[in-house]
């Protein structure tokens, strides 16, 4: 049976006569025609084995890049740790230097026996504490001995404002007359009961030894 003549005919459709999808606007048709093919599309002639090789190669490149960046980050962290440690060591060194300078200045004012005695830090602090306490007690005892309670005056010597002359009474209790006798020598002559200690007994030479302050 001979083929139908219509089957042998081929219909050629030009791009101008090709109809778009039903319901699509001219703008959508133009955008679809002008859109370039996606780069992620795999060519048809590329086999699956080649695609696997390409993916494996990209993974290896990423791993190499990550391996190169990782040592850099670790190196930066180690440098940062060393910098912090160095700053902390510098602060501690300065603190100890200031402490040693202060202790040396304190040793310079303490009466050590012998003079070239080298005290440790704790010995210096203990000696300074005890030395300050001894000086405080010395001043307290000296003040108590010098400004002690006045001796009682006999009743027969007490006068009254009405008895005797007003000049004697005013000369005794007048602030002006007392202001002129403020020297320690005059006070001792008027009140023989007051005695000024020459020096405390525990400050005499040989009374205290250097070990008493430690």
Curated annotation (Swiss-Prot):
Amino acid composition bias (Basic residues), ranges on this chain: 57-70, 79-88
Presence of keyword Transcription regulation: yes
Keywords, sorted A to Z: Activator, Developmental protein, Differentiation, DNA-binding, Neurogenesis, Nucleus, Transcription, Transcription regulation
Cell compartment(s), UniProt: Nucleus
Domain bHLH, first and last residues per copy: 83-135
InterPro entries: bHLH_dom, bHLH_transcription_factors, HLH_DNA-bd_sf, Ngn3_bHLH
Domain of life: Eukaryota
GO cellular component: cytosol; nucleus
SMART domains linked to this entry: HLH
Bias (Polar residues): 11-20
GO biological process, one term: regulation of dendrite morphogenesis
Region ranges (Disordered): 1-98
GO MF, one example: chromatin DNA binding
Primary localisation category: nucleus
Complex and partners: Efficient DNA binding requires dimerization with another bHLH protein. Interacts with ATOH8.
Function: Acts as a transcriptional regulator. Together with NKX2-2, initiates transcriptional activation of NEUROD1. Involved in neurogenesis. Also required for the specification of a common precursor of the 4 pancreatic endocrine cell types.
Protein name: Neurogenin-3
């Amino acid at each position: 049976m001979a083929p139908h003549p219509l089957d042998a005919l081929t219909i050629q459709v030009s791009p101008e006569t090709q109809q778009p999808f039903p319901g699509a606007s001219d703008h959508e048709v133009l955008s679809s025609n002008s859109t370039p093919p996606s780069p992620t599309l795999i060519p048809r002639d590329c086999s699956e084995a080649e695609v696997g090789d390409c993916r494996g190669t990209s993974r290896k490149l990423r791993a190499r890049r990550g391996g190169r960046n990782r040592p850099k980050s670790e190196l930066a962290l180690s440098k940062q740790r060393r910098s912090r440690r160095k700053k902390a060591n510098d602060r501690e060194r300065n603190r100890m230097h200031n402490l040693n300078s202060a202790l040396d200045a304190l040793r310079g004012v303490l009466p050590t026996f012998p003079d070239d005695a080298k005290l440790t830090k704790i010995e210096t602090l203990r000696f300074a504490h005890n030395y300050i306490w001894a000086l405080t007690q010395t001043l307290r005892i000296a003040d108590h001995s010098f400004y002690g309670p006045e001796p009682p005056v006999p009743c027969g010597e007490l006068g009254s404002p009405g008895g005797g002359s007003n000049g004697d009474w005013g000369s005794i209790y007048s602030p002006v007359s007392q202001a002129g006798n403020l020297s320690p020598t005059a006070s001792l002559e008027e009140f023989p009961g007051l005695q000024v200690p020459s020096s405390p007994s525990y400050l005499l030479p040989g009374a205290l030894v250097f070990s008493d302050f430690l």
